[in-house]
Structure formats: structure tokens, C-alpha cells
Amino acid sequence: VGISYVEFEDENGVLRRYRKHVNGRGLVATTAKVDPTAFVDPTAYVDPGAEVQRHAVIGPGGWVDRDAIVAERAEIGVRAHVGRGAVVGRNAVVGPYASIGAAARVQNGARVPREAKVAEGDEYRASTEDLRRLGLAA
């Protein structure tokens, strides 16, 4: 059985091609890089140029925008959005319905609360509690 593709027209009228990810069957642009150990829910999608690293999870309805990076073991919650060029650090959690703005950064181990908005270009820092959870703070 060959690889099947789904095509969408983007906001500029350019036809973009997506394939179903091996782990979870979510839609991944052919120019995105998603590790086979990452889980992409069937209702989630990863846009062109984005990268999803090892053991990351993109939850139901999650959207990883163009050129964004979701680092190792990070979790993107239900209907959460990672903006264009944003970076979600290792072991970070983006809560359900949260929005990470374009070019924003979520530090390693940080937990972005449900429905929170991280503004374009901002940095969301890990709290002491977040770091303790990971064994990184006294």
C-alpha cells in the first residue's frame, strides 16, 4: 500500500500536501519533520517546516504552525496552538485550548495553563514548582 496524501490550500493559495503520521495518524505536512516516536492525534496537524521531536505528544485538535518546534517529551494539549516559529521546550506542557504566539518560547519543563495565551515573541518561564516536578530545583 502506497503513501496517501491529503492536500489543502493555504492562506496564500498554495497547495500544501500532508500525510498521516505513523504514530497516531495525525496530519503532517510533507516538509515537516516529526519523529516516529512522537504521537500526533488523528485530529491534530503539523504545518510545513515544523519539527516535533522524540516522544512529544500533539493532543486532539492540536495545531503546530509553520516552522515551530515541539521539543522532546513536550505535550501539546487539546485544541492548543503553537504559533509560527514558536519553540516549546523539552518536557514542557501546553494546556488545553492554550495559544503560544508566533516566535514565542516556552522554557524546558514549563507548564502553560489551560486557555492561557503567550504573546508573540514572549518567553514563558518554568516555575520553581515546574522545575521541582522534574527534579531540577531544591
Placement of each model-derived feature along the sequence:
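Glycine-rich hexapeptide-repeat left-handed beta-helix
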Residues: G2-L27, R66, E72-A138
